[in-house]
């Protein structure tokens, strides 16, 4: 299949591995400690483990898993807000599938559905708008979630609802932005990153230029990467080449998809419907300035937070859950005390174990870790062979 098979060629992967090993030998920092490369996107984390790329690379290269999974960074209080909205009389609450199982303080949306709330999984905000047209006597709320990748479809759905005069449709907006998040990570004293693999899908919308501050102000290389094995290996090679040459720049490995200027139509829709919040709360990362968006006043009639009662309470994560440390790259998923024991994909306590893009789920499903050898740092039984 074009653009798939050629990016999974094992011969080329081995060639790239050899060249990566040679580059690492040229980087002085790698002689003192492992090079820490953050893959921002949860899709990259999943691909790294699915294809066994971590096992291909030298010990001197260490992936740090970033906060690029929107379901995973959703604070518990916002999940409770979703449940409160879903349980109001006459409401049909619609959401993407991953969000159904994210734990709130008492239950998940899936459990609220089992208790009688009308919660429905959709594949697009347009599905929610269709439900609103078909059920004019009901209030249909769409749970808007995701980075700039999903913002355009949400914005265009709100524009369509206004154009068609659909008054029983509203949006519970939890969209978040990637650039302030990366800046917050770079400003964190807990991390000492050497470079970044930039997100592919977000960059398709925003382009490559917004990342220039990473190279210009923080002197860190960043390479926008695709999602196939050779995409990630080549992007890593490009990051290491910058480090070996003592330079920092924004480079685009995913040029077959990502233009430097992004998608102007998508950006126009985002800017028409949304504006930046002063701050937004992230699970595990706390409050980050200008890291979320809200609906502009011109579209207030479609804002569920203005049309319905929303508790909007700040709720701390369970003490045993270490999603925050994992999201910041301070610990690896298997170093969490409840990984693989109390917290599994079947019974997740933390959001990182819920989504297929979450780092904990990726480690659990593809990490090739002998959990039985981690007792004291992580519980659980031996469910896969160690490598």
Which residues does each predicted region cover?
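Metallocofactor- and cofactor-centric catalytic cores in central/energy metabolism, strongly enriched
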Residues: 1-137, 151, 155, 159-164, ...
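Phosphate/pyrophosphate-binding betaalpha-module
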Residues: 143, 147-210
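Short, surface-exposed amphipathic charged segments that create phosphate/polyanion-binding patches used
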Residues: 78-81, 133-140, 184-189, 211-213, ...
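Active-site-adjacent beta-strand anchor residues
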Residues: 122, 143-144, 225-226
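Internal helical hairpin/lid segments
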Residues: 234-325
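A conserved active-site cap/scaffold subdomain adjacent to cofactor or substrate pockets
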Residues: 172, 190-259
